[in-house]
Structure formats: C-alpha cells, structure tokens
UniProtKB/Swiss-Prot annotation:
InterPro entries: AAA+_ATPase (IPR003593), ATP-dep_Clp_protease_ClpX (IPR050052), ATPase_AAA_core (IPR003959), Clp_ATPase_C (IPR019489), Clp_protease_ATP-bd_su_ClpX (IPR004487), ClpX_bact (IPR046425), P-loop_NTPase (IPR027417), Znf_CppX_C4 (IPR010603)
Keywords, comma-separated and alphabetical: ATP-binding, Chaperone, Metal-binding, Nucleotide-binding, Zinc
GO cellular component entries: HslUV protease complex
Xref: CDD domains: RecA-like_ClpX (cd19497)
Domain ClpX-type ZB: 3-56
Organism: Rhizorhabdus wittichii (strain DSM 6014 / CCUG 31198 / JCM 15750 / NBRC 105917 / EY 4224 / RW1)
Residue sites binding Zn(2+) per the record: 15, 18, 37, 40
Function: ATP-dependent specificity component of the Clp protease. It directs the protease to specific substrates. Can perform chaperone functions in the absence of ClpP.
Quaternary assembly: Component of the ClpX-ClpP complex. Forms a hexameric ring that, in the presence of ATP, binds to fourteen ClpP subunits assembled into a disk-like structure with a central cavity, resembling the structure of eukaryotic proteasomes.
Gene Ontology MF terms: ATP binding; ATP hydrolysis activity; ATP-dependent protein folding chaperone; protein dimerization activity; unfolded protein binding; zinc ion binding
Name of the protein described by the UniProt record: ATP-dependent Clp protease ATP-binding subunit ClpX
Ligand binding (ATP): 120-127
Amino acid sequence: MTKLTGGDSKSTLYCSFCGKSQHEVRKLIAGPTVFICDECVELCNDIIREETKGALVSKKDGGVPTPHEICEHLDQYVIGQAKAKRVLSVAVHNHYKRLNHGAKGADVELAKSNILLVGPTGSGKTLLAQTMARLLDVPFTMADATTLTEAGYVGEDVENIILKLLQASDYNVERAQRGIVYIDEIDKISRKADNPSITRDVSGEGVQQALLKLMEGTTASVPPQGGRKHPQQEFLQVDTTNILFICGGAFAGLEKIIGDRLQGKSIGFGAYVAAPEERRTGETLQQCEPEDLLKFGLIPEFVGRLPVIATLMDLDEAALVEILTAPKNALVKQYQKLFDMEGVKLGFTDDALVAIARKAITRKTGARGLRSILEGLLLDTMFDLPSMDGVDEIMVDKDVVEGRKDPVRVFTKKNKEKAGGDAA
C-alpha cells in the first residue's frame, strides 16, 4: 500500500509516482489510497501523445492502402465510373501519405488537393463517398450543403461540419484534424444572381465564402454540443489544415454552359459540334473547365480550392443492369433476401432486368430510380405474400415490368398452379 505520509509530518502528502511532497508541486490529486501530482499527469499526457501521434493514421508503417487496393474496394459496390474511382483512390492514398509524412516531422510541407465530383443525378457520387467511408480508418463524415447558411442566419453554420467530424472521431481533436469530409449537393450553394451586389445571398455565395478558410486551413471554433454560438459557450479548437474535403454535385445545367463554350470554339466549314441531344450528359461534363463552374455560380476563390475535378458519366443500360445484379448490395439480391425470409424464391428474367434499366433511363433518375421501380413492381406481391400459403416462387418478366400483367406466382401444389400473370 502507498504511504500517504512522510516521516517528518503525518499531515504531509506525497505523490505515489515521483515521491514529491504536496509542498513541492502545484496540485496533488487523490485517489483510492494513492496520490498523483500535476507534474506526473503532464508527463503521462506527453507519453500518450507521443505514442498515439503515429497511430492517428489508420495504417502503420508501410501499410498505406495503395490506389489499386482502394479502387478494388470501390469496385465491389460501385459499377463503372473508372475515372472517378481513380481520382478518389489517388487522393485518399496521398492523404494517408501526407499524414505519415507530417508525423515524421519532415521539412517539406505537402499541400492537400481537395476534390470536386461532378456528375448527373444517380451516377454514384454519394455512393462512392459512402463506400469510401467503410474502408477508411481515419474519421469520415458527410454533410449536406443545402442545410448551410451564412453565420447569423437561420440554418447550420459551416463549423457544424467539423462538429460532425469530431463526433465521428469520438471528440478526439487530433484524429479529427486528419479526417475526410464529403460535402454533398455543393452545386446548390451556387450564386443565385449574376450581379453579386443585388441582394445578400446567405445560402449561396455567403456559404461559399464561409467554406473558403475551412477548406484551405484555419483554426475553427466548434461548439461541442452543436447549435449556434453564444459568448458563454466553451469551444473546441480544430485545425482544418490536414482535413481533406471532397465536394459533390449534379450541377444541372452545367452541360449547357459547356456546350455553349464548345460551340463558340468550333468555327469554319469543317467544324462539327454534336447537338446536345446527341451527347450524353456525362460526356459533356468530361470537358468541364473552371471557367464553366464560374459561369454556373461558384466564386473564383471557391473553385481555386478544389484543384482536382472528377466527372462521372451518366449510366447506360448495361451499367444499370449490372448495378441491379453485380454489387455485394445489389438491389435484386436485397429483394431476393426479403422474399427468402418469407420462404419464397424471387426470380427475374434477363429481359425484365433490361426493361427496368430502360425505364430508369427514361425517368432520368439514374441508379437512384431503380429501387422505386422495383418497389412499384413488387408492392402488391409483398403486401399479399405474408397472408398466402403454398407460394413457392415469384417470377418477374418483361411483361410485368411494362405493366401488361402481374408477377407470376408459382405454387407448391402438384399441378404447379399459377396465379396472377396467367389470369386472363
């Protein structure tokens, strides 16, 4: 047992670790039968800080995931978009290397390269970010730009993005300062008017201005409990210099701006520029330049802080069919699992899958529209199935997708009686 008193005085207390008396230190903290002084507490903090500094990065020495490894992980869940995957894989790999490089105290400072993902709705921008989050061991958070407003107005401050990152890191400031932030719907904060002096744009240009220093690197004062700041509140200080920002948006209408620029450059009798209807949206977006983003409504300073631009293609019929069946979390597999819980098999013919993909293309909703189409096709069946007996299998073919009949129900009777689609 630790001695609580010295030999010279029964009232004098001593640190159980360094042996200094209460008169030699500023503070002596008492525990069950032990004491620790403020100097030993500070020493322990220094030891822990040094040991964890290298562990703040997800992988240890030599274990940084390669771009190929990151891309292979994305391939398991996201179909197509090879170029965007390469851009993201390299950016995240370099982010890991920057963290390792900084931890070693090298004299060369490596700057970060924030990323802008541009692509049609339903092309996989958000899914890429969500899939990336599963792989990463650094803190990762997603934010919605549509909820942000300029400081002093109703809505969320941009500092709330850093608060979400802190929450993802269990309020470990050191880890949060090395995290990754994905801001979705970034196109919704474009400038609302061509003339910036007409009125105060608190949810457009005002938010862009507020994000500038955050993305470049600043010390943000974050309220631990969230909400608006007030003078009596304590703040956490978070340095955003090493936080990687990835922004994504559909940028509806940007393809027209790009098309106008390309048509203006093509002159002469031999020049040919495909009409907008002849080009897919993704193909047009591939030729996006910073000047197009400026015309769209992003301010020059904001575009300058997103040096890497990755464009996503709109998904064609083959890609949508593959999305339905290939990924680990494919929609067809999900619905087959739901039906399997009822003891019923669910099958789709090849022409049914093609018809579903074509319907999604017609709706111009990309991969996001596939679930709503499947839900509509199977809603009545899922409603009736728990109350029915003897159903062995449900089959969906092209006629079902096109609305000419209901899904075919195969029963377990000897004659394999069919209902639903055969009723005519």
